[in-house]
Amino acid sequence: MARVKRGTTTRAKHNRILDQAKGYYGRRKNTIRIARQAVEKAGQYAYRDRKVKKRSFRALWIQRINAAVRAEGLTYGVFMYGLKLAGLDLDRKVLADLAMNESAAFGAIIAQVKSALPEGARVAA
């Protein structure tokens, strides 16, 4: 059976890891063992934070909507309840964008929500 020399394969594998570790600090960028650990950990962080990003943006949208509706005398929860009663099917991303960039349009939405709410539910604490 012929002898298999694996130098090219191993070198290619090492170079792929070192290319992924480009820009890292210290021995993490040029020592294969440490670079492999750093690249693996970076992948774990990337996977985790792709999930966290969705939660973070939703929280940001809620904060922006809450700030905008409190200026109009409502709370976030009452506003969302009023949206449902008014039959407006807008998600938080769109509402936050309207609140930040299109205040006139958001004001019209708030007026519709206030008219759809029962009388006792209009007061912000």
From Swiss-Prot:
Cellular component terms (Gene Ontology): ribonucleoprotein complex; ribosome
InterPro entries: Ribosomal_bL20 (IPR005813), RIBOSOMAL_L20_CS (IPR049946), Ribosomal_protein_bL20_C (IPR035566)
Tagged with keyword Phosphoprotein: no
Presence of keyword Cell membrane: no
Transmembrane domains' residue ranges: none
GO molecular function annotations of the record: rRNA binding; structural constituent of ribosome
One of the Pfam families matching this protein, by short name: Ribosomal_L20
Alphabetic keyword roster: Ribonucleoprotein, Ribosomal protein, RNA-binding, rRNA-binding
Gene Ontology biological process terms, A to Z: ribosomal large subunit assembly; translation
SS bond partners: none
Alphabetical list of PROSITE patterns matching this protein: RIBOSOMAL_L20 (PS00937)
Function: Binds directly to 23S ribosomal RNA and is necessary for the in vitro assembly process of the 50S ribosomal subunit. It is not involved in the protein synthesizing functions of that subunit.
Similarity remark: Belongs to the bacterial ribosomal protein bL20 family.
NCBIfam families in the record: rplT_bact
Record's protein name: Large ribosomal subunit protein bL20
